[in-house]
Regions:
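Active-site rim/adjacent substrate-binding subdomains
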Residues: 1-67, 79-134
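Catalytic glutamate of the conserved HExxH
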Residues: 71, 75-79
Length: 134
């Protein structure tokens, strides 16, 4: 995992995805491309913009730790082949993110619940700690 600021993320996003500006998380799988045989035990790199993560956390009223955990899980799922290009893929990936976070004892950020098409249960919002964790 690599933590970067928005400027560095914008460069990576433009260079590797043709995107404009920063994004929250990028995944670079090692099992693809010219370095796939260097170390088959390494999945790849997950790059997270801490500035974008902080903005997301503030926008939903959550904590930075929960947001960073979500982005790390999201990136790892990309490394092992998950995507969210279609509605079905998105539902499956979001469900897996939620299950993984909960298995780690982390209450998924509100936006994961909202992505599932339902608001979070109010009692879960009140249980969250000061940094967004359950």
């Amino acid at each position: 995992m690599v933590l970067v600021d928005d400027d560095a993320m914008a460069v990576l996003n433009r260079t590797y995805r043709g995107g404009v500006g920063p994004t929250d998380v990028l995944a670079f799988p090692m099992l693809e491309g010219r370095f796939h045989d260097v170390s088959p035990d390494l999945l790849g790199d997950v790059v997270i913009s801490t500035e974008t993560a902080q903005r997301h956390a503030l926008a939903i009223g959550g904590g930075l730790r929960g947001e960073l955990a979500l982005l790390l899980v999201h990136g790892i799922l990309h490394l092992v082949g998950y995507d969210h290009g279609t509605a079905t893929e998105r539902r499956d990936m979001w469900r897996r993110q939620r299950l993984i976070l909960m298995a780690c004892g982390i209450q998924p950020p509100v936006r994961v619940c909202m992505a599932r098409g339902r608001p979070p249960r109010p009692e879960r919002l009140h249980r969250r700690g000061p940094d967004g964790d359950a």
